[in-house]
Amino acid sequence: MRKALNSNLLLVLLLCGYAGAQEFKGHVKLLNNLFVPYPDTLVWFTDQTLENRLEVKWDVAPWLRLEAQARNRFIYGDFVENIPNYSSLIGSSNGFVDLSFLWAEGRSFVGHTEFDRLFARVSYSRFELTLGRQRVNWGIDLVWNPNDIFNTFSYLNLEYPERPGTDAVTLKAYTGSLSYIEAVYQPNKTADSSAYGVRYRANIARTDFQVLVARMAGYYVLGGGLSSELGQFAIRSEVSYFNAQKSSEKSVLVATLSADRSMGSNSFVQLGALYNSFGSRGSHEPLSLIEPRAQSPMMLSRGKVNLFAGVNSTVATLFIPSLAILVNPADWSAAVIPSLSYSASDNLTLALTGMLFAGNRTDEYPNIGQLAYFKVQWNF
C-alpha cells in the first residue's frame, strides 16, 4: 500500500509540475500485436497496448536541473489472459528504489506505470553531479554495448527506444572541450551486488575513444571503445573483460565491431559482429517476447558469435522501409525484423513491424512463432 501511495504521489507531481517546466513532451502510442505460435499455428494470440510517456524538465536555477520521465501502459488481450503471472514480467524494477507499480489488474488486462528517469543534476564549473534514476550511457555501438554495464538492454526490445534507467550517483569532470572523467556508483541491496566504475572519454584525431575500469556483482571489469571514420564508413567498437572474483566462476570477454554508412540523404546501412566467450551452442534459455531484456553485459548474446545487418531508407519523404537481421552463425538461427513506417504528419507516425524467427528449439533464435504489430504514435 505504501509503495502504491508513494508512486501515485510521484505521478501526481509529474502531471501537475508541467505548468512550471521549461520542457514538457511525450507521446501516446497504440500497439496492436499478433502472435502466431509454432508449431501450434491454429491458436493466434492478439493483444493491445496503450502507452503514454511523459517527460518533464525543470531548470530550477542555472546550476540545478530536475528531470522526471514515466511511461504508463495499459495492456489487454490474450497474452495477459493466458500467460501465468504476466504482471510480474512487466512489473519488476531493476533499480535500488522500486519506482514501478501496477494500478490495474484483471483476468485479461493490466495497468502499469514506471519512472525510468527521476533525478537532480547539479552543475558547477567543470563538474556535473547527477543523483537518482538516470540513464548511464557508456555504450558506443548501435546494437550491442558490452561497455554499458549499468544500463544493459536488449536490441529486441524494439518499442523502448528511451531504454531503462538505473538508480545511481554520477560525477562527471570535464578535462577539456571534448574530454571528461566520469565516476558512477550504483547501489544495490548488498555491497557485493552494488556496482561502481570510472570512465575516461576523449577525442583525438577525429576519433572518440574511452577506457573504463569498474566492478559489478562478482566481477571486475576492464574495457574500452572507439568511434572513428574509415573512408565513408563510421567504425565503432567496444570490448570488455569481466574478471571473475571467484575461482568457481568463469571470466568473460565480450567484444563488438560494426561499420555504418549513410547512403546519400535517404539510406543508412549497418553491419556488425559480436563475440561473447560466455556464449554456448544449444540448450539456450527460452526466448521471451514479452519484455526482452539482457540480464547483464555478459549476456548480450547466448551464442559465442552474433552477426547483424541492417538497412533503412526514406521513400518519397514519408515512407521508411527497414530491415534488420540478427544471425548466430554456429546454428544459423536468425531473427528477421522488417518494418515499414509512414509519417502522416510532423508528430504522427504509423508503423507495421514483424519479428520472424528461424531456428530449432535449442538454437539462439528458435522458431517459437512469428510476431507482427501495428503502431500508431502521436508525439507532443
Task: Show the residue positions of the predicted features.
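Repeated loop/turn-to-beta-strand initiation elements of outer-membrane beta-barrel proteins
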Residues: 24, 62-66, 126-129, 178-181, ...
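Surface-exposed strand-loop-strand hairpins of Gram-negative outer-membrane beta-barrel proteins
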Residues: 33-49
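Residues that define the transmembrane beta-barrel architecture of outer-membrane proteins
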Residues: 44-50, 111-116, 123-125, 163-167, ...
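Outer-membrane beta-barrel architecture
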Residues: 53-55, 118-121, 170-172, 199-201, ...
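Outer membrane beta-barrel
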Residues: 64-180, 359
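Detector for outer-membrane/organellar transmembrane beta-barrel domains
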Residues: 229-324
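Outer-membrane beta-barrel "beta-signal"
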Residues: 309-311, 342, 348-349, 353-356, ...
